[in-house]
Swiss-Prot record:
It is an enzyme of class 2 (transferase). Residues 14-160 form the UBC core domain. Residues 199-208 have a biased composition (Basic residues). Residues 159-208 are annotated as: Disordered. Pathway: Protein modification; protein ubiquitination. It comes from Drosophila willistoni. This is Ubiquitin-conjugating enzyme E2 S.
Amino acid sequence: MSSQYSNVENLSPQTIRQVMRELQEMENTPPEGIKVLINESDVTDIQALIDGPAGTPYAIGVFRVKLTLSKDFPQTPPKAYFLTKIFHPNVAANGEICVNTLKKDWKPDLGIKHILLTIKCLLIVPNPESALNEEAGKMLLERYDDYSQRARMMTEIHAQPAKCASTTSDAKDDDGPSTKKHAGLDKKLQDKKKEKLLKEKKRMLKRL
């Protein structure tokens, strides 16, 4: 990422206040399926959890996204990334998101909430015409069932709620050893699930 990103000192006090106000409003009244994670020490580092929309291959997942504000925000759009691995036409290998709202359609008054809602909409209606992941874009257009199966498998492996929750904050010892015990059990269940999915994938590849 460019050095112009994630530098709170370069933002005007007015912009910082505006961003913090919007983040606090979203924390108090969250949009459906979106939970914002506030970093009070650096408002240029904005993260959120987005629930996979029902009726999509992402439905069972929770996806962590990151917005980094440039020094010229809001005159220039932020950069947006999926931190959770995802198989999607408009998401590059490094997680960068391609959406017109953050390119040619950007307007300074759109705000953080609008960006996060746009990203959620992208999970419902991908745009294969401007694909950053060409394989996913081609598969969506030509073999939708295969695309859906691949996207669902990636979601089951990488976007489980427990996995996202474990990355939102460092582990705390407040609840004593039982918390760690449950975390260990969760990891074993995840490993078993991952092993099962890999076996299913191998069986599918043999059929091709």
